[in-house]
Amino acid sequence: MKRRSVLLSGVALSGTALANDSIFFSPLKYLGAEQQRSIDASRSLLDNLIPPSLPQYDNLAGKLARRAVLTSKKLVYVWTENFGNVKGVPMARSVPLGELPNVDWLLKTAGVIVELIVNFVASLPASAAAQFERIATGLSGDLEAARQVHEALLEEAKNDPAAAGSLLLRFTELQTRVIAILTRVGLLVDDILKSASNLVTQRGQGDGLNRFRAVFGTLRLPEVADSFRDDEAFAYWRVAGPNPLLIRRVDALPANFPLGEEQFRRVMGADDSLLEAAASRRLYLLDYAELGKLAPSGAVDKLLTGTGFAYAPIALFALGKDRARLLPVAIQCGQDPATHPMFVRPAESESDLYWGWQMAKTVVQVAEENYHEMFVHLAQTHLVSEAFCLATQRTLAPSHPLHVLLAPHFEGTLFINEGAARILLPSAGFIDVMFAAPIQDTQATAGGNRLGFDFYRGMLPESLKARNVDDPLALPDYPYRDDGLLVWNAIRQWAADYVAVYYASDGDVTADVELAAWVGEVIGSGKVAGFRPITGRSQLVEVLTMVIFTASAQHAAVNFPQPSMMTYAPAICAMSAAPAPDSPSGKSEADWLKMMPPTLVALEKVNIYHLLGSVYHGRLGDYRQTGFPYAPVFSDRRVTASGGPLERFQARLKEVEATIRTRNQARRRPYEYLLPSRIPASTNI
């Protein structure tokens, strides 16, 4: 009975945990948060009368006021390294009221949760679905009506800014209405848990892959469901998928990957060779050794999902001599060649090798999801931004120009990170169910990756150089690199223009005591590896570029592929239900299907990844306050004047958008995750 109950709680739409966790559904908290935002907005109106300034140029009264504000902030924004499920990682001890999400975010997120409820209900037997369909339809209608009221209030405030104050009462009524809808969402999930538990275990009992397709009731089955076994598509994941950060060019193969010349030529043709491919910069490698305990190799038994496996494979890819497309060459399913044989991509005529090859690719995809979710997504975006958010609030006064610039890039970050720690990472939580490794090892390994992430080496240009993939002549088709650099450079120019407004010289940088305190907190309390004192304007620009890019574009690139690329379990999953293949030949489709995860894992993947990848809140370049009526953040005419830094940044983003859309017309598959119009300003989901 316990297993069945937890099974349904896993099914219940990632909204189950949300609905039953007070951090998401606490009316008093949200009302208090809006009151706090109103207070902050009032302060902002006063602050707007005086342009932001560096502390060294403030008068005595101003310096005392700054010190008082920061003293109070430090009582609210408190560091801890003992937050549950992410111990050792610097986090906020609790989420301050002003950091809770606003009505706009709640409406968007609630809409996605209801969409997931409808999807789940649609795949229940008709007799059980009827009552839930009626309630879910009503919730959808109420949410749409609330959205329309929200849009109408914003339009009124836009047309008559002076009336914004008088609209606050109606906005408060809307907020109460939205909270009531969220409460009903929670009740509906509870009802599903109570009434449908005996039906859930009957779901997805079709043959082959049918059970994985069955979890898409009303949600559109992603295109990857029909293409994931294709070798070219498998290779394209490395340059345009959710984890485009691991592939690197190599001049020679590692000693523990003994692919022979004859094997290479079987794949790439008799007129090619390993030596020639290496010399002409056409060899590319994935090595998942860094997974460590995320890849236990042996069987791991869990109550809810049975036996699971994950490995640390090595995979070789190569370009043909025409450099037209990247293709997989060979896979070794673990680090030791003595225990893991080499799998070489078979020709169409080698049918006896087909399913062994598919099994080896599944091993790679299991490693890929582990690496993506725990490292490049959670550790290197969410948890890195957490440190900069706390340091900014604790050391930069609200009147500091860098606080004004950076705060919008941290909207929602503390809140969503606490949610991740509480809901995704506990024992029997989403990650424990979906991933093979014991949850304690998963938590520790993800935390270790965050603490080991080097800030300067992680900068996009440096990361590309370190992996030898920065040259488009060597690797022509790398959408993440090409589009990412466009966005990086636009942000860098914006940071340079902004810094020039307030810092006249390098001396202004070194004389800024609040900036020095910020650096000290990032290094000391934030434990950001590689971070160091900032001694000049050019270095400050690079630092700001990295902070903003990480919170916005980098998170977008690794988060928003999830619904289209990661919800279909056979395409990618963080555990397999059977061990890696022991031989390239003699395998069947039945052997490959045994590697597919339990239906529970497939259900949880749909729910959590669709939710995380479907909420777009805020937009890069659109700097607005979090409280109604979401007024502009910047008031300094040196920043906002026509033709000034902000307008130039927004114009550059439009140019980047146009360039990417033009590129997508020529690409085999559009790469849309770094379109500026689809990049939220902060890591808020």
From Swiss-Prot:
GO BP, sorted A to Z: fatty acid metabolic process; lipid oxidation
Source domain of life: Bacteria
Catalyzed reaction equations: (8Z,11Z,14Z)-eicosatrienoate + O2 = (15S)-hydroperoxy-(8Z,11Z,13E)-eicosatrienoate; (4Z,7Z,10Z,13Z,16Z,19Z)-docosahexaenoate + O2 = (17S)-hydroperoxy-(4Z,7Z,10Z,13Z,15E,19Z)-docosahexaenoate; (5Z,8Z,11Z,14Z)-eicosatetraenoate + O2 = (15S)-hydroperoxy-(5Z,8Z,11Z,13E)-eicosatetraenoate; (9Z,12Z)-octadecadienoate + O2 = (13S)-hydroperoxy-(9Z,11E)-octadecadienoate
Keyword presence, Cytoplasm: no
Domain spans labelled Lipoxygenase: 122-685
Localization, UniProt: Periplasm; Secreted
Annotated cofactor note: Binds 1 Fe cation per subunit.
A Pfam family hit: Lipoxygenase
Pathway(s) annotated for this protein in UniProt: Lipid metabolism; fatty acid metabolism
Binding site for Mg(2+): 133
EC number(s) given by UniProt: 1.13.11.-, 1.13.11.33
Root EC class: oxidoreductase
Cofactors that this protein relies on: Fe cation
GO molecular function: arachidonate 15-lipoxygenase activity; linoleate 13S-lipoxygenase activity; metal ion binding; oxidoreductase activity, acting on single donors with incorporation of molecular oxygen, incorporation of two atoms of oxygen
SUPFAM superfamilies with a match to the protein in the record: Lipoxigenase
Keywords of the record: Dioxygenase, Fatty acid metabolism, Iron, Lipid metabolism, Metal-binding, Oxidoreductase, Periplasm, Secreted, Signal
GO CC, one annotated term: periplasmic space
Binding site for Fe cation: 377, 382, 555, 559, 685
InterPro entries (UniProt xref): LipOase, LipOase_C, LipOase_C_sf, LipOase_CS, LipOase_Fe_BS
Signal peptide: 1-19
PANTHER family found in the cross-reference section: LIPOXYGENASE
Function of the protein: Exhibits lipoxin synthase activity as part of a bacterial evasion strategy to suppress the host immune defense. Oxygenates polyenoic fatty acids including eicosatrienoate and docosahexaenoate to the corresponding (n-6)S-hydroperoxy derivatives. In turn, this production of bioactive lipid mediators promotes bacterial persistence in host lung tissues by inhibiting the expression of major chemokines and recruitment of leukocytes.
Family: Belongs to the lipoxygenase family.
Protein name: Lipoxygenase LoxA
